[in-house]
């Protein structure tokens, strides 16, 4: 809205006024720049001298820098920048002019007229509305809307992916179920049904009852099997014992075919004073050996008995020992026989306790002061269980006693066992009648 000059003004309109406003509007449009706060800056007017540029600051307007006259942009040159001015009120010079020209004339009347013509422009600047903010609000709204739509799109993508994964899982489970069902039906058709399979369906109680009854039957069968196993074991043991008795009975027969003077049934005995002590198992410490009425260890006289079953032997400690046998009379000794069970029959699985190296001595008198060496021999446990050794009794001599000295065994570290010892020869009678009859002894 433009204002005309007041009637009392010293300046009057003339033909130059339209051109001034047209040029002023063009220059102001080109020189005015708007900022975000709605303020504008006006450039220098057309035809304004250089002194006006310098005096602009005195009237509240920004001073113009020196340049092209008129302050307009010509031939593409840039217009000088102006300092910002306040749009909230009039300048001091303009206010003084409106109130009746109280201010002093700053120059020529043409300058005053130009200042008065600038008042409508100043009024228009004061009445200009604030810049619209609809553009910034719409841009903010669209930004929020775009962010919201992007979040919604991301959520929809996640939901779609979950749906796809669930669909894939459902498809896999379905295919697996179909495969298992086909496999089950194939097994049912391929495997023939059992002949004894019950056709009717059993209840849970009936099933438990049958399982319990079958369990009892199994327990009974196990008890019977254990009983049969014990019986078979006992039968085998009895059979083995009977076979062993038969074998040793055959062995105990007069296999040597020579008289035995070291037999307890014909009067032979053991001289305990000159015989090694019995073996006592100190590791196990047999309880029955401590009782006087029961002695588990066999005495030395067992070697004078024909019973040579495994375990029925005389054992002495270590691998060296001796035994002295009283003969039933004076006997011209010719042979000595040792008997030991074979390793296959021994309970320990071997014959390491059998004697190996031994020597035989003949005792001349009852005081046993004189010993006659009759030979040294080796008992080969792997050859035969009965082995006879010829004595070196030449010329033949009669002895009332015979000593068997064991020098070593077959490797047992704790004891040595003697099962049976036989003494062969000719018994010499001490009476004169026998001497007259010319009884001579010799080996048989």
From Swiss-Prot:
TM annotation in the entry: 137-159, 166-188
Feature: compositional bias, Low complexity: 19-36
PROSITE patterns in alphabetical order: SUN (PS51469)
Keywords: Cell projection, Cilium, Coiled coil, Cytoplasm, Cytoskeleton, Differentiation, Flagellum, Membrane, Nucleus, Spermatogenesis, Transmembrane, Transmembrane helix
Domain of life where this protein originates: Eukaryota
GO biological process, one term: cell differentiation
UniProt GO cellular component terms: cytoplasm; meiotic nuclear membrane microtubule tethering complex; microtubule; motile cilium; nuclear envelope; nuclear inner membrane
Main location class: membrane
Tissue distribution of the protein: Testis specific. Exclusively expressed in spermatids.
UniProt region (Disordered), positions on chain: 1-109
UniProt membrane topology term: Multi-pass membrane protein
Domain SUN: 267-428
GO MF term (any one): protein-membrane adaptor activity
Localization annotation: Membrane; Cytoplasm, Cytoskeleton; Cytoplasm, Cytoskeleton, Flagellum axoneme; Nucleus envelope
Coiled coil: 204-241
Function (record text): Involved in spermatogenesis. Required for sperm head formation but not required to establish and maintain general polarity of the sperm head. Required for anchoring and organization of the manchette. Required for targeting of SUN3 and probably SYNE1 through a probable SUN1:SYNE3 LINC complex to the nuclear envelope and involved in accurate posterior sperm head localization of the complex. May anchor SUN3 the nuclear envelope. Involved in maintenance of the nuclear envelope integrity. May assist the organization and assembly of outer dense fibers (ODFs), a specific structure of the sperm tail.
Subunit field text: Self-associates. Interacts with ODF1. May associate with microtubules. Interacts with SUN3 and SYNE1; suggesting the formation of a LINC complexs; a SUN domain-based heterotrimer of SPAG4 and SUN3 may associate with SYNE1. Interacts with SEPT12 and LMNB1; during spermatogenesis.
Record's protein name: Sperm-associated antigen 4 protein
Organism: Rattus norvegicus (Rat)
